[in-house]
Amino acid sequence: MNKLSKRLEVVASFVNDNSKVIDIGCDHGLLSIYLVNKYKNIKVIASDVNENALSSAITNIKKEKLENRIETRLGSGLDVVKADEIDTIVIAGMGANTIVGILK
């Protein structure tokens, strides 16, 4: 698996074990994969609005044999989860206006 960029390593450092995370705009799924490899008790939902990006994430998740640890969902922002499913939101690699729109 490809190594995380320094930026994503910093993002990952704010996540704790036992977290219930949604990785919004997961792209290739690298951050989600990194988190489940780093933490044994974490739950991760990797989501993306772009079907091709999510397909790439699914491929990478399968390559790492992590299908049972990372759930994938196609959809926009927080629309793909219920409030009680998560306690940590990760939005990395998007512009400020996009992030504000997701959080509204």
Question: Where would I find each of the regions flagged by the language model?
Answer:
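Short SAM/SAH-binding signature in class I
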Residues: 86-93
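A short, conserved alpha-helix within the catalytic core of class I
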Residues: 97-104
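Conserved class I S-adenosyl-L-methionine
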Residues: 18-27
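Glycine-rich SAM-binding Motif I of class I
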Residues: 29, 33
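Conserved SAM-binding motif I beta-strand of class I
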Residues: 43-48
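S-adenosyl-L-methionine
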Residues: 55-84
